[in-house]
Amino acid sequence: MPRYNHRTLAQMRPIRITRHYIRHAEGSVLIEYGETKVICTASVIEKVPPFLKGAGQGWLTAEYGMLPRSTGERMQREAAKGKQSGRTMEIQRLIGRALRSVLDLKKLGERTIQIDCDVIQADGGTRTASITGAFVALCDAVGYLRAEKIISENPIKDHVAAVSVGILKGQPLLDLDYAEDSSCDTDLNVVMTGNLGLVEVQGTAEKVVFSRQELDVMLDMAQQGLQELFDLQRKTLETAAS
């Protein structure tokens, strides 16, 4: 089945990561998955939540949001509504879990890294782009802490990234854009570490159930895409640091 954007079934959209995008943040990137664009920042806060006071470890938490005109029709700001949607809370918890999976909180010391992911243009895959970009922002925030001799050891244990896969008209597809995501039979978000450990697999049969064999095919396809993302993360971090 040809994809309307001329990609092959197992081909990612063009991915770009621009570091140091926000001047004031200890770590920041603009990440682009095709036409999806997300600003990710990592801010160092010299305190921990009350439940961790005196525990000798740090914390990482995340917030996620979409600009009103990041979509085809203007959305009302959640701040104007007075509460966050269930979707927003689900996504920001996912981002936090994903990044904590590769972070040694004891080496971070009693401080918090606050991740903020703001979608400025949405075309599918905003949560996966947020995780992949936020990891690079986290690396820069940790780099700041080490350069300032606030911490001595690197608390980051591995890379982490995320990608979507799905089944549309019986065909598995990698890295769904909005048109594909809104019409697919199955939608899967896969979060994985650089050593190929699974952090999270979110899968839903939208219209037609999927088989165990199809799940394995989608996971293999996701792993292929994630390898590309890990390579890009490494190159981005190395290039800007040299």
From Swiss-Prot:
Q: Which CDD domains match?
A: RNase_PH_bact
GO term, biological process aspect, one: rRNA processing
Q: What is its EC number?
A: 2.7.7.56
Query: Which keywords, in A-to-Z order, does the entry hold?
Result: Nucleotidyltransferase, RNA-binding, rRNA processing, Transferase, tRNA processing, tRNA-binding
**Which residues of the sequence carry a binding annotation for phosphate?**
R87, G125, T126, R127
InterPro entries, per this entry? ExoRNase_PH_dom1, ExoRNase_PH_dom2, ExoRNase_PH_dom2_sf, PNPase/RNase_PH_dom_sf, Ribosomal_Su5_D2-typ_SF, RNase_PH, RNase_PH_bac-type, RNase_PH_CS
- Presence of the UniProt keyword rRNA processing in the record: yes
Name of the encoding gene:
rph
Q: What does this protein do?
A: Phosphorolytic 3'-5' exoribonuclease that plays an important role in tRNA 3'-end maturation. Removes nucleotide residues following the 3'-CCA terminus of tRNAs; can also add nucleotides to the ends of RNA molecules by using nucleoside diphosphates as substrates, but this may not be physiologically important. Probably plays a role in initiation of 16S rRNA degradation (leading to ribosome degradation) during starvation.
The molecular function terms in GO held by this entry are:
3'-5'-RNA exonuclease activity; tRNA binding; tRNA nucleotidyltransferase activity
**According to its UniProt record, which protein family does this protein belong to?**
Belongs to the RNase PH family.
State the protein's name.
Ribonuclease PH
- Source domain of life: Bacteria
Checking Gene3D superfamilies in the record gives: GHMP Kinase, N-terminal domain
Q: How does this chain assemble? A: Homohexameric ring arranged as a trimer of dimers.
Record's keyword annotation contains Acyltransferase: no
Catalysed reaction, written as an equation: tRNA(n+1) + phosphate = tRNA(n) + a ribonucleoside 5'-diphosphate
Specify the species: Nitrosomonas eutropha (strain DSM 101675 / C91 / Nm57)
Which of the seven top EC classes does this enzyme belong to? Answer: transferase
